[in-house]
A protein has these predicted regions:
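Acidic, proline/glycine-enriched N-terminal capping motif
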Residues: 2-136
Length: 136
């Protein structure tokens, strides 16, 4: 009898951060470049990590997974609820920092396990981030 596949699903009601991991700053010390996160990126990582920690699965994923993420940005009144957001930030930049935070929180052993990824961003009356993780 096969083991039941793990699945995790949750919604984090929040205004999603728009700062992304791509926004590294560089300082030069003793002739060597030092990369660091500017304060807004550091704050975004802390916000995501604090919210994600509440939804950590009972055990880490250790096999291939599908990650479905829906980023719901606050509607500015110019868009319909659920309309696709086709402006910055880019989905790949959002996802990189998000997966790094999920790794830090212990969702999986390594984000290389994410073999299938669906990421969408919308304008929404109720902002937040919807997440679903499925074992493949």
């Amino acid at each position: 009898n096969a083991r039941r596949k793990m699945m995790t699903e949750f919604f984090m009601a929040m205004i999603p951060p728009t700062a992304t991991a791509q926004e590294h700053k560089v300082a030069v010390r003793n002739g060597k470049p030092i990369f660091y996160d500017p304060p807004e990126v550091k704050a975004a990582k802390e916000k995501l990590t604090a919210n994600l920690a509440r939804h950590r699965p009972p055990e880490k994923y250790i096999c291939g997974i599908r990650l479905i993420t829906k980023w719901l940005f606050p509607n500015d009144g110019k868009h319909k609820n659920g309309e696709y957001k086709i402006s910055k930030p880019d989905t790949d930049n959002l996802q990189k920092m998000f997966k790094d935070c999920m790794t830090l929180c212990g969702f999986w052993t390594d984000d290389q396990l994410v073999a299938s990824e669906i990421c969408e961003k919308f304008w929404a009356d109720i902002p937040g981030i919807y997440v679903r993780i499925e074992e493949l």
